[in-house]
Amino acid sequence: MKVLIIPDVHLKPFMFKQAAELMERGIAKRAVCLMDIPDDWDKQFDISLYEETYDAAISFAKKYPDTAWCYGNHDLSYVWHVPETGYSTMAAYTVQKKLLDLKEVLPESNPIKYAHRIDNVLFSHAGISKDFVDLYVPKIKHDDVDTVLNYINNLGKMKMWYDGSPIWLRPQYTDVKMYKSQQFLQVVGHTPMETITKKKNVISCDVFSTYRDGKPIGTEEFLLLDTITWDYSMVNYGNY
């Protein structure tokens, strides 16, 4: 299946508009969003931008209800009341309400999760390590991927809010062993990259994030992935 991945958003409503137009052109059958919808440099008081971004996400969710949504650390900081870099106390109510609005438009069978699986590809905000699975999933269950994801998706703040979890891991800069690294590809965001990059069985695609002055860190391209063959390409909206 061809899948279009929307990486970390961070108050960029245009990402959903561009992704919607690409989907309309038939570029992919399904979309995945790695979230981190709120927060960006020095935007804590721009409540209208928070509203606009969530409204764009909700509009996209209505149009493409089978989109897989993966919680990011910035999303959960408002759910769990744990201030994060860029956290806006002014926008907290707006984020909480709009996140509920987003949840309400999603099908009951397709809620926001920490991790989703499509064919032999695992999608999460930051990545699922073998150590994390060893820590929180009974060993006898490790070969049943859907059961492993079910265990993970039912964990709470105490187990998820730390550096090794699927909302915080940074496999780009360490030699951490990933879960089922020979059998499954993982697609992650979280760590800003200059370009969409594959390292072993992990594709990192957070290429829309910016420096504090607003200059893009990455190429601002979407990842287009075949979940069967693992073939992938980078899609620049302006050139497609």
Regions found by a protein language model. Name each.
Residues H10-M15, D39-D42, H74-H81, S129-D131, ...:
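Active-site environment of divalent metal-dependent phosphoester hydrolases
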Residues Q172-V235:
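Conserved beta-sheet core of the metallophosphoesterase superfamily
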Residues I6, L11-L99:
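Core catalytic region of metal-dependent phosphoesterases/phosphodiesterases
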Residues I5-I6, Y71, F123-S124, V188, ...:
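Short hydrophobic beta-strand that contains or immediately precedes a catalytic carboxylate
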Residues M90-D101, P107, I112-K180:
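Active-site-proximal loop/helix segment associated with metal-binding centers of metalloenzymes
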Residues M1-L4, H116-F123, K198-N201:
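Beta-strand-turn-beta hairpins that frame and shape the catalytic cleft
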Residues E24-I27, K62-K63, R117, K177-Q182, ...:
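Flexible, charged surface loops at secondary-structure boundaries
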